[in-house]
Amino acid sequence: MSTNKITFLTNWEATPYHLPIFLAQTRGYYEREGIEVAILEPTNPSDVTALIGSGKVDMGLKAMIHTLAAKARGYPVTSFGSLLNEPFTGLITLKGNGINDFKDIKGKRIGYVGEFGKIQLDDLCSKFGLSPSDYTAIRCGMNIAPAIINGEIDGGIGIECMQQVELERWCVSQGRPRSDVQMLRIDRLANLGCCCFCTILYIAHDEFIAKHPDKIKAFLRAIHSATLDMLKDPVQTYKEYIHFKREMGSELHREQFERCFAYFSHDISNVPRDWNKVTNYSKRLGIIPQDFEPNCTNGYLTWELDPDEKDPMGKQEAIAEIQDEIKQKGGVFSGNSLRYVEPANL
């Protein structure tokens, strides 16, 4: 085996927002940087932090809240960059299912992806005068949208650019308007000020980072090049992604990519403000101890980073407007490449 080989585990099966990872492969950026990256997909997304944290895989992707929890549970992992920033996440349901505000979950069947989704739901129950016994929790994994469609649950925790799009497309196929899909955003319900707990991160085993800093930097340079290519020409780079991953050519995946586009990190950096918010939120949920320090670094990024966002709440509102316009008019495949800010290095 080449000593320059890196094993990389995605957070679940190939999705539209994995494009930069595969594009860096197809455009030869890993090879240019002198590394060979074996891209792996998990059969169970819940195994990702354990596999990386045990050293069986070098690096991969995971959401921020899972990355914090993994370190608190003894898995030595650290985030060294971000892929998808603050995708809107919340309780998704269909009009007519009887859930118009959070209190309406009483007596309902509510789906969640994994362990921390249940913890978040129970925390919100205490905020809204409910108890965990007031609703039926059903673990659905990544299949929130099909579970709603099949009537197995009345609503479930999902991401706007993924599960919500899947449910919207089903509504259209049934002659129903997209507006029949509703989301109660967790950041608003919990007064977080951001949806950063579901930011998708690049993470690695601490020992791998310590022993191979040059590999981390090389990987990031390759990913940065691929990310900038994607932001400059999303249509062409997505065509290349389809050539590598045929399933990405479906109308569902193309639309999910359009809705992911505004969330892509431009400079791949960890955002300290977001990490502080999610760390404090995780402490409140009891996921990590009170003395926990964020397990992230920007020390391996070798380019100028974007300036700190001066109005993060304003950014959230602007992105919400962008996402609504894309939902109504189409995104990059309709010539609409809206995103919140222009990348600094384009």
Curated annotation (Swiss-Prot):
<keyword id="KW-0539">Nucleus</keyword>
<comment type="subunit">
    <text>Homodimer.</text>
</comment>
<dbReference type="GO" id="GO:0046872">
    <property type="term" value="F:metal ion binding"/>
</dbReference>
<dbReference type="GO" id="GO:0009228">
    <property type="term" value="P:thiamine biosynthetic process"/>
</dbReference>
<protein>
    <recommendedName>
        <fullName>4-amino-5-hydroxymethyl-2-methylpyrimidine phosphate synthase</fullName>
        <ecNumber>2.-.-.-</ecNumber>
    </recommendedName>
</protein>
<keyword id="KW-0808">Transferase</keyword>
<dbReference type="GO" id="GO:0106344">
    <property type="term" value="F:4-amino-5-hydroxymethyl-2-methylpyrimidine phosphate synthase activity from histidine and PLP"/>
</dbReference>
<dbReference type="InterPro" id="IPR027939">
    <property type="entry name" value="NMT1/THI5"/>
</dbReference>
<comment type="pathway">
    <text>Cofactor biosynthesis; thiamine diphosphate biosynthesis.</text>
</comment>
<keyword id="KW-0784">Thiamine biosynthesis</keyword>
<feature type="short sequence motif" description="CCCFC; essential for catalytic activity, may be the site of iron coordination">
    <location>
        <begin position="194"/>
        <end position="198"/>
    </location>
</feature>
<feature type="modified residue" description="N6-(pyridoxal phosphate)lysine">
    <location>
        <position position="62"/>
    </location>
</feature>
<dbReference type="GO" id="GO:0005634">
    <property type="term" value="C:nucleus"/>
</dbReference>
<dbReference type="GO" id="GO:0009229">
    <property type="term" value="P:thiamine diphosphate biosynthetic process"/>
</dbReference>
<dbReference type="GO" id="GO:0005829">
    <property type="term" value="C:cytosol"/>
</dbReference>
<comment type="similarity">
    <text>Belongs to the NMT1/THI5 family.</text>
</comment>
<dbReference type="InterPro" id="IPR015168">
    <property type="entry name" value="SsuA/THI5"/>
</dbReference>
<keyword id="KW-0663">Pyridoxal phosphate</keyword>
<feature type="active site">
    <location>
        <position position="66"/>
    </location>
</feature>
<keyword id="KW-0963">Cytoplasm</keyword>
<keyword id="KW-0479">Metal-binding</keyword>
<dbReference type="Pfam" id="PF09084">
    <property type="entry name" value="NMT1"/>
</dbReference>
<keyword id="KW-0408">Iron</keyword>
<comment type="function">
    <text>Responsible for the formation of the pyrimidine heterocycle in the thiamine biosynthesis pathway. Catalyzes the formation of hydroxymethylpyrimidine phosphate (HMP-P) from histidine and pyridoxal phosphate (PLP). The protein uses PLP and the active site histidine to form HMP-P, generating an inactive enzyme. The enzyme can only undergo a single turnover, which suggests it is a suicide enzyme.</text>
</comment>
<feature type="binding site">
    <location>
        <begin position="114"/>
        <end position="117"/>
    </location>
    <ligand>
        <name>pyridoxal 5'-phosphate</name>
    </ligand>
</feature>
